Amino acid sequence: MAKEWAATANQNGYANCYELECTDLKILDLNAEQFCILHWLTILLQNREFDTPSGLAYEAKAYLIENFKVDYSTYDAIIGYRADDSYFSFAQDFINGTISYRQLNNAMHLGKLGQQFVLKSRKAFSLIKFTGYELAEHTEWFDKKNKRDKSARREYFSTERNKRQRGDIYITQIMDEEMKSDDARLR
């Protein structure tokens, strides 16, 4: 996916190649069993600008930060969903009450948008080794990026956003019932 992000509509790019020995790193894996999608969303809310135009979105953001906050300050790296525009829009819809928790979970797998490995400590950066680079030709990779993103959004709008299911849990219910990360319904 690095090549998809490297190339622009009219210009080639480069994808750098690295090696990283992770043995001595403390890694937060947001895909681990003790976490749910709301932990990832909370980290996203803390680190990206989120438009919270409605009272619901503002309240949802505050609730998630209070109840699903992960102390990642001592970690060297974090593994989790990519925070690209597609995922960001799915998360925005969830805190605005447009989609359910189930729909958010499903949306995160549309278009195979992938995971990211984020280095965040000096220790992690000191262990990374540059091994080379690969050309990302814009004629191939920019098109792939657009197709992947459009595919995810098309799947989202044609299936997930329009299909409410009986028993779906929305952010309002999570807040009203004061659900926490150990709630079985969020697993």
Can you say where each PLM-predicted feature lies in the sequence?
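A glycine-rich, hydrophobic loop/mini-helix early in the fold
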Residues: 13-19
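Short active-site loop/helix that positions an aromatic residue
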Residues: 2-11
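Active-site and NAD+-binding cores of ADP-ribose-processing enzymes
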Residues: 19-187
